């Protein structure tokens, strides 16, 4: 099992490391808050985001800090008390398979999906200290918005994306330089920020379950703020392996208004769960 700090999702992504931030007690008042806007009239997406409907699961330590836990059969060397949350068979692995939104692969690719799924502990790229990529990474933990760009920060601080929103289109040279997070540009569709990303490598999965993709992957993310609630939805297109675009389950996240909230520094990635990988016990 690798240690990598990521933003959690019950449906889309696998959490591979602990994330600790300040408690977000004030974020409960979301429905009646006014939507802040930038000087040009666009919704201001800036802030720390988490929890809410379809957001990350909330666990708290004895000091009230919100923590995300390794989905492993055993605790990591520096892990917070695991409790039952580490048993992937009864939480994320199970609930992830209950989601009705799943990618539909072309017939010739299903054998590979099944093989990767059955051999997850050996084949899943996140166990090799690789980034989760998009859309598996899920929504950002923190957004910083300016007039010309948005910056998405994810758990642990290692992964971030700088996305222009000044109307430019994809740079054809950079779009061919395949990466884990692709080449993204954004534009406003009314009050919704639309982020269009291409230029991915084929080294990540769309989600747990062996859901691989090709380097023809395209991901469109939509973010809309209503008061202190951020609505997030991603759609995947991959003409090489998918029959049709896959619309992931929408998520709602709440604004964390605690001024002490922070993103902890990431740590080196290690393999420590080799016994389970060898015995093929599912993560």
Show where each model-derived region lies:
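PEST-like low-complexity, intrinsically disordered acidic/proline/serine-rich tracts
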Residues: 2-11, 17-283
């Amino acid at each position: 099992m690798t240690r990598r700090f990521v933003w959690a999702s019950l449906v889309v992504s696998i959490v591979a490391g602990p994330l600790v931030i300040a408690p977000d007690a004030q974020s409960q008042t979301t429905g009646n808050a006014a939507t802040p806007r930038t000087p040009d009239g666009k919704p201001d997406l800036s802030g720390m985001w988490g929890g809410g409907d379809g957001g990350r699961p909330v666990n708290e330590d004895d000091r009230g800090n919100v923590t995300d836990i390794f989905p492993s059969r055993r605790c990591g060397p520096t892990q917070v008390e695991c409790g039952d949350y580490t048993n992937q068979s009864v939480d994320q692995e199970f609930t992830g398979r209950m989601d009705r939104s799943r990618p539909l692969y072309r017939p010739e690719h299903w054998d590979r999906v099944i093989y990767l799924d059955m051999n997850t502990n050996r084949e899943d790229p996140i166990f090799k200290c690789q980034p989760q990529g998009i859309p598996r990474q899920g929504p950002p933990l923190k957004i910083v918005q300016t007039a010309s760009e948005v910056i998405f920060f994810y758990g642990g601080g290692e992964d971030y994306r700088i996305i222009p929103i000044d109307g430019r289109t994809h740079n054809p040279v950079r779009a061919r330089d395949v990466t884990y997070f692709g080449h993204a540009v954004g534009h406003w569709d009314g009050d919704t920020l639309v982020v269009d990303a291409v230029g991915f490598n084929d080294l990540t999965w769309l989600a747990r379950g062996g859901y691989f993709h090709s380097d023809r992957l395209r991901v469109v993310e939509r973010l809309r703020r209503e008061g202190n609630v951020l609505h997030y939805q991603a759609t995947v297109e991959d003409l090489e392996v998918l029959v049709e675009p896959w619309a992931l389950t929408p998520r709602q996240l709440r604004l964390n208004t605690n001024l002490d909230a922070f993103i902890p520094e990431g740590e080196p990635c290690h393999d420590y769960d080799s016994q389970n990988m060898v015995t093929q016990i599912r993560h």
